[in-house]
Every structure is written in structure tokens, then in C-alpha cells.
UniProtKB/Swiss-Prot annotation:
Zinc finger feature spans (SP-RING-type): 585-671
Organism: Mus musculus
Mitochondrion listed as a keyword: no
Region (Disordered): 1-22, 243-262, 289-308, 317-408, 732-920
Protein name: Zinc finger MIZ domain-containing protein 2
Native organism taxonomy: Eukaryota, Metazoa, Chordata, Craniata, Vertebrata
Residues carrying Omega-N-methylarginine: 111
Amino acid sequence: MNPMNPMKPALPPAPHGDGSFAYESVPWQQSATQPAGSLSVVTTVWGVGNATQSQVLGNPMGPAGSPPGGSMMPGVAGGSSALTSPQCLGQQAFAEGGASKSYVQQGVYGRGSYPGGSSFTTGYAGGPAGLGLPTHAARPSTDFTQAAAAAAMAAAAATATATATATVAALQEKQSQELSQYGAMGTGQSFNSQFLQHGGPRGPSVPPGMNPSGMGGMMGPSGLSSMAMTPTRAAGMTPLYAGQRLPQHGYPGPPQGQPLPRQGIKRAYSEVYPGQQYLQGGQYAANTAQYAPGPGQPPGPASSYAGHRLPLQQGMAQSLSAPGPTGLHYKPTEQFNGQGASFNGGSISYSQPGLSGPSRSIPGYPSSPLPGNPTPPMTPSSNVPYMSPSQEVKSPFLPDLKPGLSSLHPSPSASVHCDELRLTFPVRDGVVLEPFRLQHNLAVSNHVFQLRDSVYKTLMLRPDLELQFKCYHHEDRQMNTNWPASVQVSVNATPLSIERGDNKTSHKPLYLKHVCQPGRNTIQITVTACCCSHLFVLQLVHRPSVRSVLQGLLKKRLLPAEHCITKIKRNFSSGTIPGTPGPNGEDGVEQTAIKVSLKCPITFRRIQLPARGHDCRHIQCFDLESYLQLNCERGTWRCPVCNKTALLEGLEVDQYMLGILIYIQNSDYEEITIDPTCSWKPVPVKPDLHIKEEPDGPVLKRCRTVSPAHVLMPSVMEMIAALGPGAAPFAPLQPPSAPTPSDYPSQGSNFMGPGTFPESFPSATPTTPNLAEFTQGPPPISYQSDIPSSLLTPDKSTPCLPGQMAPAGHLDPAHNPGPPGLHTPNLGPTPGTQLHHPNPSPASRQPLGQPNTGPISELAFNPASGMMGPPSMTGAGEASEPALDLLPELTNPDELLSYLGPPDLPTNSSDDLLSLFENN
């Protein structure tokens, strides 16, 4: 039995079983499917004169005469070359009689009839292991001692004069081959077997059948006939595999019929060979990197196993990359064919996707990341890494992926987590570097500031705190960001990209905390032209998410329905309602009804949370979240209906309009009419005039985090229904019960019992009921709005979850559990400051106790709240904490929008935020 080719007539074996492979000639197999436009050049070099053993050509790289990992010839690392394992003569598989007949070849690592060592047969169902054929051990390296010199000579000659086969075909033929090279296979396709040199360093070979150019009876992209590919390992992997024997294994594949995500993959292995099942193989030896994916994981693309090789010589096996959007275009299909009776050389052909048409992304080995499939790393190596044509050195351990420029160079202003939109407010006493000018004609200037460790940790843990660095014109009272074209900024030797936008109003500031470090920090400003007209400033800013601000407004600025109705009646009695013309277009007195649109004037979509400014005299509302998003970057804070100033702290959420929107939320009405008695009815939509709405307003992120039905009490909805047309009775909502952590998984909820808001929001007019009276709870407790202490408590905003709200700015450490060790030691109980408002509430102020202190290790995850916080909070002021009853989903009611306070609020020198920073 000839174990090396069990399907061929047995030949008399040599003493070591290699006699049949010594100088057996293999003719050139011209494929009938070779394109007419192909060109093949084959060069054969003679001169191998001393072949003492048959292994000289069958295994030209016998490494016994070379130390493990040593290089026997220039350009080849550790005994590897283009002829690492040339096609053993006679071992090419030729499909005879179509796809129904195939020769079963020896496995990839199989050698045969050598005692000792471990076998390296693959686990294909069509291979020897799958047919129950005996596996064979690898030959000991000592058998190659006498052939070392001849092997080196043969390999050197073969490598130096390796044949180059280039294929240039027409564009359509090229694309046709690439698209059909997988689908043309039959279930009985032959699997080619190749052989590595024995006893020498071993690397990952190309499994037969996995290379589109190495499949028997099939045309590869190079246009060559059915020549089996030689498994070529990377030269850089030589030292790691020197002297090792690898265990038997098989390349893993997905289970039969399992779909494989197509990311640059033409077809999954199980689809290419429906009748063949790849075994779930293991990995290489334990001290090597894992090449095969774990069981159950889909393998990489077929071309990846053949596509990732190191260059043999700069001019011979250079990696070829065609320009393309992403991924690798390096797809060498190294094919070795026995040419003649005494030279087992071969030609190396490279398929260049970019030669004759648009490039096609072909990922290299390791494969491109697939969902659920970690990219297997390449084996570490001390030799030269893979070199691209642009001479960029790429790590041999990492996949050669080319992400977009945006991911390679993220904008420093992109500090928004989870795509959350954030508002930006200056912090009182938060200026780190006072506004300064650059010296005239000074090209490079350095500006140093210090960050204490505690402040740095707080900045890192609080996503709503940032260090903002911006430039503005010295005459701009609003200090709008404006970067001169010649300004470049780097922080701690890290260059930052400045977003200047299309016009001067779209310039964005830089946010530096991601490049800062504890202690000394240096901002370097480089200019090529004079910028004396501009000022630079570094300040601490509070950047609450839109979600948290939205929640705070819902809790503090939700005007009761009675208030809204009173306001509407008063406007009717006065005879004028600006901005809302009557049905006949008249704005005069004695209006019978007012037509109000249910669409937001910003987005032209159905309003979700109706709001307007405190000074607005119209009933028409805008969508609150859209308004906040509109003012994120450069807030003008003007009402889109009447263009009056509508600052954040003066916004009002109209509970009356909200009830109407909830009542008709499942209808297509676009307008309603409201009469002087506040009775309302929808305006029927005319079918001939109804056009599907297209949002032609600003493109805003729609991240609805509020369930409006939970904002209104059943009595309010009953009142809305009574004032409505009465077409269908409104089913009242169930009274909200006291919230529990399991019922409302909101962040940081510590309020379990019935109660009311910590402080009633200042009412718009002294005669209208405020929010605390509307909630019908116990008297409100005082609220302590202190910005410096709030900046030392962690933000609890989390990614957007349906029906879940993030709290607003966390302002009171006693009410906000957070990392206790982050509070500044010198901060004691601080008196609260009050928002400037036309009619402030005369609630008394009770300073609360000092926040809890303790190591950061006390942090624990509370599954009920979904946030990190101390296991138990027993600080002062917690025992009498009231809870919400009106808004069960909205927790942390102690957080008023106090971060909106102007910088001239009363300050306390003991907790001046500026003391947290050390300026030079």
C-alpha cells in the first residue's frame, strides 16, 4: 500500500516510503475553462545536481541542517520559501467523470508511513480521516540530515527564480469567474492535498478546498488549470513552530446548513460543499496562538486562508492591494506545479482584483470580524511583518482591517456617549484658564493647567462633566465658538481635530478630558497667522443629556391642566391671542374658536410633549424634546412660534394640550379647535388635501423616552374627555401606585413612599396653583441647589431605554448615591442657592448633611435601579426623603434645574469650584 496516494496504483516504495515522489513527472494540466485572454509564463530552472535522497525535491526545506527558526537563504525566514511545500508529484487531484467522482487525497499535514511523531491529517469528510483511512505519522527530522545542503540549494534556486504567472482577462470574464468560482463546485469535488516539509517548522497551511484557486477540476481566478495550491505558511512564524509537532486537528466549519453572515464571503463552506462536513477542530499546540475558531464558531472567508502570507522576496511575492472602500484586496493564489522530471518548482500567480475592474474586498487571514466570531489572532513572530505596497508595517497579530477615517481619527468633540444629545452650560466658578490672547506673531505657545487626582477621577466618572476649550472673537459678547483657520491645538502632545463646519456659526469647541491626565497638562496652540483678535478659554462645563433635562422639565415645569385652562380663558377674555389666528384668519376680538396645530413647528411631526415659553401668549405648542435638540449645539432659546426668548428654565409643559394629544393619539388629526370655554374638538382631515407628511424641519434624533400617559392623573384625563367632543368615553387610567424598584427600573431611585416634590417650582403667576398643590401631597421639603457639590456626584444617565428616563443634573450629594470617595474632603454642608425667577417660592432652606464618605470599592450594582451605587445609603437627610406619587416613572425629584443658574449667584468661598483646580 502506498499511503501517500491510496487511490493510485501502488509503486515500489523507497526505504522511507518516498520513492514514488522522487522524480515523478506531472504534465501540465490545461483546463478547458481557461479564459481566452489569459497569459501564462512558465520558467523552469535546472541545476539541482546533488539529490542524494528523494526528499530533495519532495521536501526541499529539510531543516535538519538548519537550526530551528534559522533562515537557510536570504528572503526566507526559518526554512520557509515559496516552495515550502511544493506540490508532491502526482498528488494533484483531477476530477474525472464530473462531480460524481473524486480522488481522495492525503490530508493537509499527512505524510505517511513514517514512525514516530504525530499525524497531521485534516478532518474533512472527504479526506482520509473522514473515510476511515489510517492516519500517518510525520517523519522525524533526523532523516533529513544528509539532505540539508541539497535542500537549501534547491530551495534557493527555486526561490530566486520562481516562476511568475500573471493572468490578465477581460472585465466580464474576471467578474464572472469571481462570482461563480464557488457556485460551480459540485458535491463530489476533489480535495487536493499538499505536504509541508517534515520535521521542520510548521505553520498554518491552506486547507484543501478552502482556496478557490486550489480546488481540483476548477478554474481559479488566475486562469491556471486545476493545480493544487501548496500550503504556504508565513515566514514570520518560523521560530514558533521550530521543532514542534502539532496535534491532529481539522479546520472547523459551521454545522450543516448553518447560515454564515456574509461579510466579504462569497459562500459558506457548508454551502460550497453540501456533502462535506468539516469537523469541529481544535487549535494548534497550546503554546501557539489559536488559528482555528472554537467549536461552533463559523470560520472566516475561504480566501482568507490563502490570502495572508508574508512576502518571500520584495519583487516576487509582494502583497498586492487594490484601492477599495474597506478590507483587504491581497489575494495571492500561490500555485505550484511540477514542471518536468527533475524540477518540482512552480509559479506564483497573484490575482489582482483591481486590475481590470472595480475592486472586490477580499479579507485576509485572520478573517474580518463576524457577528459572534472573535477574530483569531495570528501567531506572534519576531520576523518581518506583513508589508503592504505602501510599506506600512502592519502587526502580524491583528487583522488587516481598514476602518473609515472617522473611526481612525475620532473628533475630540464626539464625547457624547451612546449618541446622546447633550446641552452645554457653563459651571459657576468653573473657569480653569481665564480668557487669554496669543502673543503677537508667536507661532507656538504652551499653556499649562493642573488637575488633581480626585478631580480627574470625577471627570472620568461623570459623563455630564467636560473640560471645554474654545476660541471666540473678542467682540462677541455671546462667546460663540469661532476658530481661525490657522489655529491647531494639541493637548499633551495629542493633536486634536477642530470641527469648523461649513460656516462660522457651526464651529464646535474642543472637549479635552479624554486626553487629559492627572497632574500637569499642557495645551499647545500652533498658528500660522496672527490671531490677536480671538480669545481662548478653558472652562468646566456641565453637559446633561437631553433625556435628563427632559425629565427635569417634566417634573418641575409640568403646568397643571387647571392652570392651562385658566390661561386660555384669560387670553380669550382679553380679546387677543397673539400667534393664533381664528378660523377665518382674524386676530381681533370676539373670536369663537382658535385653531391649534398638533404638529411641531420645528419637525412638522406630531407633538409628543407640548411646551412653550413662559412669556409666550399663544396656545400653539412645540415639541419639547425637539426644542431641546434644536438648542444643543448653539442654543438661541427662542420660541419657534412667536420668536420670543424661551429660556430653558422658563419652559412650560402644557398638561391640557398633553391630555388632548393622549386622547387622540391613535388618530390622524392634525389640528384641533379650542373655544373660549376650553372645549376642544378635532378638525377633520380632508382626504383630497391630506398629503403624507415629510419631515422637512431640522434632522433631529427621535429618542422618545417619555410615556406621556404616565404624566397625567386619571382625573385630568376625565376632564379632557369631558371638554372634548364626547365621541367615545375615555377609559380612565388606573391610579398609580407607590413605585417600587422592580416596578420602575429608573436610575438611582431611593424614593419609595408617597410624597411630593422636594420643592414646588415657582409658579408663573401668584394666583395659579403650583405643582406642589396639584400633587396633593405633604408639604414640600426644601431643595438645596448647589452646583459645586453637584459636580462631585456621579451622573446616572444610561443609554436610552424605552420607557425609562435618566435623571436630570444630580445636584445634592445627600440625595444622590454615588462613588463616595470622590467628594472633596473640604466640602461641608453648603447653603442652597435659588434660581432667579419672577416669583420665587418662599420655601425655607434646610441644609442637608454631608455626603457619605468611603472607599470607591464600596460601589455595588443594584439590579433594581440598574446603576452603580453604594450598597446602602444611610446618609443624613435620607430618612425623611419623600417620594413621587404623581409621576411614578420620574424619580430623583430633588433635582431642579439649578445648573442653569447664572454665574453671579451667591457663592461660598469654602466650596468654590475653582479651588479644585491648580493653575500655573
